[in-house]
From Swiss-Prot:
It comes from Bacillus subtilis. It is an enzyme of class 2 (transferase). The keyword Transferase applies. Keywords: DNA-binding, Methyltransferase, Restriction system, S-adenosyl-L-methionine, Transferase. This is Type II methyltransferase M.BsuRI.
Length: 436
């Protein structure tokens, strides 16, 4: 069943809201089988994965759609805290040299990353010294994945985003199938995937149902939960779906982290913009400049010092406003203005949004190597990396239960034996298994 229609200005396919549940299911299966026909045409990957630095005393991590490494850094920090203690790990995290001295003690050991974003890969290489194999290749063309204990990834979600077109027909929405293909090949004990809140309602919820079913079909007990980053010490309103799976033969019941910050008794106060960037008023570093679009001005994009930031977007132009100066003023339906003039306001700087995403100050973001492009274009590369990242402290919270389990798991399995795995299993084989 094909659901293509001609509506000027609305693209090639029906918006998700126009589909019935049966329509959604039909389109999903159609797109899944389209994805199964992707050609994987190279054996070069074998040479790459043979170089991975697999450790028998660590939880070896494979990171897909790795970006600049926010999710990976949070896991590494949680793995270090599980070994040397929370306070010692967090103190070390503030200083690059001290953290680099200790980071090899982390229970998590990243051995392989995959991403196509060149500048993000440069950032990753700068901030993750060691023996990580970086595979800058379209995941649909990666034939072999290395053995590992844990797979992480925030698979692309352009059609899931509440700010996006919300089409269930975007091919990039089905790259999660290649995440599943990596699970089938590598058979890690655990996986963690992150995505935007919008995936919960896309296609009347059927898209998420299908994704969970597909992950489970790979041999995992799967669960998901919507978490808000501000509940874990992140000065930002950022809701994300965290999908977690444990291989069915592993006796570990993952429990999502309880909030550490909030207004309830016993919790730490929410972190605010003042806590995060209040000391950068006189030295914020470079920031994106330019006029504000009508869409931008149709929303109040300014928070006060004592609030949490809006969600950081993957765009310099869409960066939230700095909290300094007067608040925006509403003058009509969906219309806001700067009462004291546009010239008295600016967007959050690269350094400020990195702080809001809880990256340490020593973490460096690449602008690329093309010095001929405009300053805004170079800065936008950094905004995109940071906005796409999982906040480090949210990642740490998600990782902590796994880190604590991992220490006992490795003690009981000192040689970290991994079952023999068939590395030639393709997405076509997965689909035959899933639909049989």
């Amino acid at each position: 069943m094909t659901l293509k229609i001609d509506i000027k200005g609305r693209g090639k396919y029906k918006p998700a809201s126009d589909y019935s549940i049966d329509d959604v299911k039909n389109v999903l299966m159609e797109k899944i089988f389209e994805e199964s026909s992707r050609i994987i045409n190279s054996d070069d990957d074998l040479e790459i994965i043979e170089k991975v630095d697999f450790r028998t005393d660590k939880i070896n991590v494979l990171s897909l759609f790795s970006g600049c490494g926010g999710l990976d850094l949070g896991f590494e920090l949680a793995g270090l805290a599980a070994v040397i203690g929370e306070q010692a790990a967090m103190e070390a995290f503030k200083d690059k040299d001290r953290f680099n001295e200790l980071r090899n003690k982390s229970i998590f050991h990243t051995i392989y990353t995959n991403d196509l974003f060149k500048e993000a890969n440069q950032t990753y290489k700068t901030n993750f010294p060691g023996h990580v194999i970086q595979h800058e290749k379209d995941i649909r063309q990666v034939k072999y994945f290395p053995k590992c204990n844990l797979i992480l990834g925030g698979f692309p979600c352009p059609g899931f985003s509440e700010a996006g077109p919300r089409l269930i027909d975007d091919d990039r929405n089905f790259l999660y199938l290649h995440f599943i293909r990596s699970l089938i090949q590598a058979q890690p004990e655990i996986f963690v995937a992150e995505n935007v809140k919008g995936m919960m309602t896309l296609g009347k919820g059927e898209v998420l149902n299908q994704i969970i079913e597909d992950f489970a079909s790979a041999g995992y007990r799967v669960q998901f939960k919507l978490l808000n980053a501000r509940d874990y010490g992140v000065p930002q309103l950022r809701e994300r779906v965290i999908i977690e799976g444990v291989r069915k033969d592993i006796s570990f019941n993952y429990k999502y982290p309880s909030p550490t910050h909030g207004e309830e008794t016993g919790l730490k106060p929410f972190k605010t913009l003042r806590d995060s960037i209040g000391d950068l008023v006189t030295d914020p570093g470079p920031y994106f400049t330019g006029s504000y679009s009508s869409i931008y001005m149709s929303r109040n994009r300014k928070k006060s010092w004592d609030e949490q930031s809006f969600t950081i977007q993957a765009s310099g132009r869409q960066a939230p406003l700095h909290p300094g100066g007067l608040s925006m003023k509403k003058i009509g339906k969906d219309k806001w203005v700067f009462p004291d003039g546009e010239e008295n306001h600016r967007r959050l700087s690269v350094k400020e949004i990195a702080r809001v995403q809880t990256f340490p100050d020593w973490f460096q973001f690449s602008q690329g190597t093309n010095s001929q492009t405009s300053i805004n274009n170079r800065l936008d590369k950094q905004y995109k990396q940071i906005g796409n990242a999982v906040p480090v402290l949210l990642a740490k919270a998600v990782a902590s239960p796994i880190a604590n389990w991992a220490i006992n798991y490795l003690e009981s399995s000192p040689n970290n034996k991994i079952k023999n795995r068939e590395r030639k299993l393709s997405i076509r084989t997965f689909l035959r298994i899933k639909t049989s």
